[in-house]
Amino acid sequence: MRSNNNNPLTRDEILSRYFPQYRPAVAASQGLSGGSCIIAHDTHRIVLRRHHDPDAPPAHFLRHHRALSQLPASLAPRALFYTPGWMAVEYLHGVVNSALPDADELAALLYHLHQQPRFGWRIALSPLLAQYWSCCDPARRTPFWLRRLKQLQKNGEPRPLRLAPLHMDVHGDNIVLTSAGLRLIDWEYAGDGDIALELAAVWVEDERQHRQLADAYAARARIDARQLWRQIRLWHPWVIMLKAGWFEYRWRQTGEQQFIRLADETWRQLRMKG
């Protein structure tokens, strides 16, 4: 279902106009991006997502809806409704753990995603990193950040190993263990890109866990494991800068202390690695 109304509505207006029998249940806690709530009617639940990023164009939110509309139920919740500023998606019943699944299970899930038809829009990190720099708190801009940004822009993004649809925010809170298997939620950063970029961006605990995931994926995708790992390492500086910039971006938008703590920790990691 899609509305033709071009003016963003409040949550209460959305409920009264399109979901009159539903009431807010609990806020969605998965992920860091916010902007979600769960609405319920008797035992039936729906996730209502708001376009929460004032600096992102409406087209980005529409892409999120299109990605969910295109993906199979074996990967993601179904898109149920869209109107400018809001969408409703299927609520997935299951267990959410902060820890990632084991390497084989996660590799199978990501490989299944990467076998799907492409979304139709490319993920471009260079302009995104530049946006984070320009939109962050000016007091947080450092010569170190600018040097790293310019070096990445000079080098250019790695040539893709394989192009596929990517999720780009894979961590434990965005994976639901349903009765039918693992599913991914929170697809707002989805787009087409290198499979090694996806693997580089997974929120792993350490390099050992990262290598296990890469090896499991290589075996499933029939890719040389050493070649895949080299490609992942090429993307690594981009991913670390992406995370640091995103934390800074969200800090400027929200003022929430969790983001500044995460940004500081990510900058420390970058400085330690030179």
UniProtKB/Swiss-Prot annotation:
GO terms for molecular function: ATP binding; thiamine kinase activity. Pathway: Cofactor biosynthesis; thiamine diphosphate biosynthesis; thiamine phosphate from thiamine: step 1/1. It is an enzyme of class 2 (transferase). SUPFAM superfamilies: Protein kinase-like (PK-like). Keywords: ATP-binding, Kinase, Nucleotide-binding, Transferase. It comes from the Bacteria. GO terms for biological process: thiamine diphosphate biosynthetic process; thiamine metabolic process. Catalyzes the ATP-dependent phosphorylation of thiamine to thiamine phosphate. Is involved in thiamine salvage. Belongs to the thiamine kinase family. This is Thiamine kinase. It comes from Salmonella agona (strain SL483).
